[in-house]
């Protein structure tokens, strides 16, 4: 009797683990698709030529540790992805009617970012059962917040000029590419529990 119960419990655990893994892979696949769309839409929001704006370049000091997608635990990676997307969304939501940018492209871009955040929050809920290094995750998200604050300060110091936004758009392109790489890494890992 004990052996039969043990066998049934093991089958249930195995089935739920497989379902969990499939759901994660589906969410990650959707995340990568939406991220590709965000990159395309961001490139449509160009107002000034990049060459014209080169003298206005700035190094926003994206934390180098945050740029290496191969060194994270799952929870850390999810925390970084969430914070980056949340900051990008907040940055662009505040300027939905910037001169020279088509409002429809901006709205599409924001919708895509919002979708990414929803997919990511679903992933984070699925991973919430696992223990994580919250102190390290908090430190990394704080670094990302400081990075985006430097971007906001730059825009303010440049009076939100067209060139400043072009420089920021290029920088955000880097961020979205990083998000794409990190999501790909998580997909390859399978994010198995």
From Swiss-Prot:
Keyword annotations: Antiviral defense, Cytokine, Disulfide bond, Glycoprotein, Secreted, Signal
InterPro entries named in the record: 4_helix_cytokine-like_core, Interferon_alpha/beta/delta
Species the sequence originates in: Sus scrofa (Pig)
GO molecular function: cytokine activity; type I interferon receptor binding
Function statement: Type I interferon required for maintaining basal levels of IFN-regulated genes, including 2'-5'-oligoadenylate synthetase, IRF7 and ISG15, in the female reproductive tract. Directly mediates protection against viral and bacterial genital infections.
Signal sequence range: 1-21
One GO term (biological process): humoral immune response
Nucleotide-binding recorded as keyword: no
Residues with glycosylation annotation: 139
Superkingdom of source: Eukaryota
This protein's record includes keyword Ribosomal protein: no
Annotated S-S bridges: 53-163
Name of the protein: Interferon epsilon
GO cellular component terms listed in the entry, alphabetical order: extracellular space
Family indicated by similarity: Belongs to the alpha/beta interferon family.
Localization (cell): Secreted
């Amino acid at each position: 009797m004990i052996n039969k119960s043990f066998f049934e419990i093991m089958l249930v655990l195995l089935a739920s683990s497989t379902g969990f893994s499939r759901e994660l892979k589906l969410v990650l696949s959707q995340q990568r698709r939406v991220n590709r769309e965000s990159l395309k839409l961001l490139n449509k929001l160009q107002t000034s030529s990049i060459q014209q704006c080169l003298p206005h370049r700035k190094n926003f000091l994206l934390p180098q540790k945050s740029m290496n997608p191969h060194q994270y635990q799952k929870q850390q990676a999810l925390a970084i992805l969430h914070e980056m997307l949340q900051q990008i969304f907040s940055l662009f939501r505040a300027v939905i009617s910037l001169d020279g940018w088509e409002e429809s492209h901006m709205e599409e871009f924001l919708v895509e970012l919002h979708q990414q955040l929803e997919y990511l929050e679903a992933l984070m809920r699925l991973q919430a059962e696992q223990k994580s290094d919250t102190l390290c995750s908090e430190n990394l998200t704080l670094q990302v917040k400081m990075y985006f604050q430097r971007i906001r300060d730059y825009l303010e110091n440049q009076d939100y000029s067209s060139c400043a936004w072009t420089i920021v758009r290029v920088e955000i392109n880097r961020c979205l590419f990083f998000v794409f790489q990190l999501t790909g890494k998580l997909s390859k890992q399978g994010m198995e529990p």
